[in-house]
Amino acid sequence: MPLSSSQSSPPSSQNLKRKQQTISSFFTKKPQSTKPEESHGADEKQRTNGAEEVGNENRAPPHTADAAEEDDDDIVAPAPKRARTNAHRQKDTDQTSDGPPRIAEPPKSSQRTELAKFASSPAGAAEPEEMDEEEAQERKKEREKLHKQFVRRLGGPDCLIGINRHVSGEADPALEEAAEADEDEEAVQAPPAKGKAAAKKGGGKLTPMERQIIDMKRKHMDKILAVQVGYKFRFFGEDARVAAKELSIVCIPGKFRFDEHPSEAHLDRFASASIPVHKLHVHVKRLITAGHKVGIVRQIETAALKAAGDNRNAPFVRKLTNVYTKGTYIDDMEGLEGPTAGAGTTAATGYMLCITETNAKGWGNDEKVHVGIVAVQPATGDIVFDDFEDGFMRSEIETRLLHLAPCELLIVGDLSKASDKLVQHLAGSKMNVFGDKVRVERTTKSKTAAAEAHSHVSSFYADKVKSANASDDTQASNLLQKVLNLPEQVSICLSSMIKHMTEYGLEHVFDLTKYFQHFSSRSHMLLNGNTLMSLEIYQNQTDHSSRGSLFWTLDRTQTRFGQRLLRKWVGRPLLDKSKLEERVNAIEELKSMEKVAMVERLKGVLGKAKCDLEKILIRIYYGRCTRPELLTGLQTLQMIAQEFGDVKSPEDSGFTTPILNEAIASLPTILEDVLSFLNKINLHAARNDDKYEFFREAEETEDISEHKLGIASVEHELREYQSVAGKILGRSKIQYVTVAGIDYLIEVENNSSYLKRVPASWVKISGTKKLSRFHSPEVIKLLRQRDQHKEALAAACDHAYASLLAEIAANYQPFRDCVQSLATIDCLLSLSSIANQPGYVKPEYADNTCIHVEQGRHPMVEQLLLDSYVPNDINLDSEETRALLVTGPNMGGKSSYVRQIALIAIMGQVGSYVPAQSAKLGMLDAVFTRMGAFDNMLAGESTFMVELSETADILKQATPRSLVILDELGRGTSTHDGVAIAQAVLDYMVRSLRSLTLFITHYQHLSSMVHSFPNHELRNVHMRFTESGSGQDEEITFLYEVGEGVAHRSYGLNVARLANLPVPLIEVAKQKSAELEQKIRRRRLAGLMSTVENIMSDSAKNDEGLITRLISSAEQL
């Protein structure tokens, strides 16, 4: 049969792709059909099928010919044949006649156009259409064959393409939910729409679970919801996008909005991301660390109880069970293990701080605000409150924020502009002075907030009083009275915090009013925010880590709770001389050789206390403690109490100092209670978190025993049924098997006669080529009963465990006191380790305000430097020399020297030994510093403005018992103004305030002030150095020693040389410096000559002022 030229050529690279038909092909002579009637019938059938398919385009399954034709360019296939014999057509018809009718592929629009244009008759037009349909089918088969070969060569279904297909299949929420929970399957979809409208329409009806998720999300729009679906927790919509970004997991595309917005109408499901159930807390911790609020939505019913209930056809009941933020996350299992935080890391305090303030009064520098704060540490139960007035610099707020270092802030009402900017500055940056990003929430404050807060707090604590035992009536009434006497602003904060913590289920922390502390109690030295940063008390100023800080230097603790207590000691040094002496005497006793055995015993006990007992106790109090964690905590308490079981009174402890005796004597007092709780617990089951066997048999509740008996009864009936099933199958006895977690399966061989005896009522569960596995109706019924008993047993076990936690929580205070005693011992041992270092001495405490130190050293620099630190003496006394004017070359060690003095004073009042040869310290009530140069762009304040504002705050707060450090005051303005301000401030500090003062300056003119203090209240000292060489070879050697007198040069050009400024630039600067020095020297010489002339005159011979000026001018020359 003749073929057209386009078909007769062999396959080549040019015609491997499908080409558009030419006009001549329609006029080529066609072969005559041997059965015209049959052919005509087939044509009619194909036209009918083709028409049907055009109407059902949107119902075509994926990978149809239409989809494949779009990818023709990507698939290499042989050139198609144009005609086939009638025998072949008949054969194809016969092959497909038994199966379902095959839907013909719709012709392309271009083909239909050509047929309409060139066909001479309907009959003639049908035949080319028939060829196109057959050609498409053949091409489809060839493509499928090629695809199978392609997949086979890549490695089968496990290759990359196969994996991707599996993943995309699993991503379907309906399939996933069906696998995890049958009751959460998608609702029955409406019949698919016909015609092209179906392609434009989106997914249509929501599933019951999706409606459930939308309802929950609308109530909790401020949270990222992790929803339990079977064995996974899933995020939906916008939550999925956030979770995918923060957790680096896959987000399956879909709808991101929950308001059914028209822009997402074409999407048929929500975007989703998922995490495994056992990894929940790992991912939750990452989300809250990023600053998010996370809600956990759990299935609160199980499949067995659901199947037995009335809502078996409804989705699982789900409920928001937990809400977490950075401050309220107490379920951190990792934080309970390990002794202390890693070296160099910043120890987060975990405080949640609530702040409110009244409307600002005054304007500008006279602005005043009244502030109230309440800070809660949910992980330990500590509560700090304060009520104070703050000035326009907001230094008081800054001090408290830096001391408490909160991880979360709750702002009640609107803050003033200055306060809000300060809070945002401290909390807003990714890595700030707190070491991490701080979460900030805001809540409204009504005009009647004070009255509402008083009423709310009163009712909250009144309920606690009512529920208290009769024996606790006095304590409860005292508790209520203490709370009602709180200041108004504190009450507002307390009420807001109670409401806020109720959302997280942690409101019970406010029951522990024994641990309420006032921040501003004057029993501690005041270290304000500037001091904490300048002296690097908690963090260094380089990377804000703890390495290189005073806390890092003193921290040798072995436990987490000991580390937290030491942090409080370092930030709040004592003012009580008797308590200080008691603490330092205890350290002296711990480091003595006579007590080595007892010290090793204490260290051994602390070394065994691997868990964070303080956090475990508060988790028990909240009812959040896990079974293995409870066992660990109780066993640790038992070990501690038994270790000192021989101590019946403080005198039996083996030490002489009261603080050690009382701490050790309190440890064995809890032994009886701890043993009573441990005796209820099955050790092996608790360790393996087995809730069903957690309690010893004698301690099990009636409900637990009842359901265990019910399970045993059902299992007995199942064993009895074995013989019945055997009779049905004609066997003597059958054995149950368990496959893939499915119990009580009855196995029957496929090729045996027993298979014919299996009743039709038996349900086939699984099978292989050789075996079939069945459940009979009786087995199914009994298994359902067993599952119901199991679920009820689980609920009974959880209830009994919660009751045990509540019973232990009733003993919270004695247990907490024991842990606090252990933390005190840990801190004292840490400080004794510091005291054992060479060069540390026990300080002597004086009643007057003084600092007398011989050969003192900087505690942190000494540890960080490999070279030996140059020691220096310090002598300051309120009745003698109470101020030092420190001068010296740049980089000569001035700042290190004054910091060293302040740090030794702080260490002494912490109760630690100090790095010196000898030390006599008075009780300082505060340390104030004004160091460094920086502006405050947020407040529109220049460097000099900030400098003077901080100085003004110091002058208002400092007392004769304070230590004040001022570093280069006045450098932010012109020399004349700077000198004038510095001189006035220094004179006021020494003469009027009478504070101990260290004043660093490069203004040599100030050195003459010593002459105005005849009793040597002010003294000049300088950092010594040596000069060698001259000109370009001039070198300065820093000795880092403190000497008497004044350094008349700062040697700034030496620093320029060390900074590698260009040599020509340095030479020009040196020339200009020499010219200026000569000019100033000539002026001073002229002034000196003028003074001499005045003195020589008869009228001024006895003028002492002129003689003093003469001496000063001569010294400056």
Swiss-Prot record:
Residues engaged in binding ATP: G888, P889, N890, M891, G892, G893, K894, S895
Pfam families: MutS_I, MutS_II, MutS_III, MutS_V
Sequence ranges of Basic and acidic residues compositional bias: 35-47
UniProt entry tagged with the keyword Transmembrane: no
Region Mispair-binding domain, residue ranges: 200-327
Signal sequence extent: none
Residue span of region Disordered: 1-143, 172-205
Protein name: DNA mismatch repair protein msh3
